[in-house]
Design a protein with these regions (language model features):
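Charged, amphipathic alpha-helical interaction segments
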Residues: 12, 28, 52, 87-90, ...
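PIN-domain endoribonuclease scaffold, especially VapC-family toxins
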Residues: 24-92, 96, 100, 121
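Short beta-strands and strand-loop turn motifs
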Residues: 8, 78-80, 111-113
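Acidic active-site catalytic centers that drive phospho-/nucleotidyl reactions
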Residues: 6, 95, 114
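Acidic, PIN/NYN-like endoribonuclease modules and their adjacent C-terminal/linker elements
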Residues: 2, 71, 103-136
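Short, well-structured N-terminal submotif of metal-dependent ribonuclease cores
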Residues: 1-39, 53-60, 129-136
Length: 136
């Protein structure tokens, strides 16, 4: 199953946020056997920016990115996908880009903490906890 992970799922563990255990459990399932983990290209820059700002260390942020790249696949998107996102009517453009990337990689499910932002999605949207309950 192709799991498309929103940026917030990748950052839960680093920032030790509520729900980090479930997010990390979903990431652990992205081992390429039963499930593969997919992210948008721009997730890398967003994650780098946030981790560097928190840690005040570019090397720490780069290591975080390298860790992601050790298991994640990148959704291949095009100009047309970006245009679709821009014209989608979604309130948050970054979420629209995430959604366009999930469609581009033919994701089976989008895993996010912001399920309300994806209410018009044709792809099922779940929190990490919902996913783990449905696919233990």
């Amino acid at each position: 199953m192709k799991l498309f992970l929103d940026t917030n799922i990748l950052l839960d563990g680093y920032f030790q946020r509520t729900g980090a255990v479930a997010s990390d459990a979903v990431i652990a399932k992205c081992d390429g056997t039963t499930h593969s983990g997919w992210i948008a290209w721009h997730t890398l820059s967003n994650a780098f920016y946030l981790v560097r700002g928190h840690s005040k260390s570019a090397p720490t942020a780069l290591q975080f990115i390298e860790d992601i790249l050790s298991w994640a696949e990148l959704a291949e998107t095009t100009k047309a996908d970006a245009q679709q996102a821009a014209g989608s009517g979604m309130k948050d453009f970054e979420d629209a880009l995430q959604y366009a990337a999930a469609i581009a990689c033919a994701a089976d499910v989008i895993i996010t903490r912001n399920t309300a932002d994806f209410k018009t999605s044709v792809i099922p949207v779940m929190t990490p906890e919902e996913f783990l309950a449905a696919f233990p």
